[in-house]
């Protein structure tokens, strides 16, 4: 999503029943387009796994697991919360992005436009103009999940490849691979599509005593 390093995700995710029922016969790109076009708000849960290995035939291993929940309202408003094994929150109100690390009692603040762009967060929380920032390609079907591969058009992004998977129109997961060969896997569950969400749900107020760093 924005920056998947240290303790950050980049951070990063649902449409009317009739539209999503048709997704069972649709290709992955068509399902993705339906997701970004028709899902204006959503909330759900996620599990994030950091995967190592795979080079030169070495076995894959899970190096770390975290979990939490998310809420979003297109375009550009979201809350992405890590709850286990540590607490961290990424919040965006449509203009600014706030990254709050509870253990460090620190808030990092930056303009959202500079953070979204060609990041994986743009797929889940941005506008529906994915072709502007990504090259889309069908990624095939594995274990019943249809995958879309998205390659950022910009050359200065942290991620060289992003994949997003759907099962019969339902959002299932994302795979993020950075320029160093590290892979992050996200699986989604308990997704509620198009709930009514007030603007106040995305308003972030730094906790009392927290250090605020503006970038």
Swiss-Prot record:
- GO terms under cellular component: periplasmic space
Gene Ontology BP terms? lipoprotein localization to outer membrane; lipoprotein transport
List, alphabetically, the Pfam families matched: LolA (PF03548)
Give the subcellular location.
Answer: Periplasm
Name recorded for this polypeptide:
Outer-membrane lipoprotein carrier protein
Tell me how this protein assembles.
Monomer.
Signal peptide span: 1-24
Keyword hit for Metal-binding: no
Its keywords, alphabetically, are:
Chaperone, Periplasm, Protein transport, Signal, Transport
PANTHER family membership: OUTER-MEMBRANE LIPOPROTEIN CARRIER PROTEIN
Classification via InterPro entries? LolA/LolB/LppX (IPR029046), OM_lipoprot_carrier_LolA-like (IPR004564), OM_lipoprot_carrier_LolA_Pbac (IPR018323)
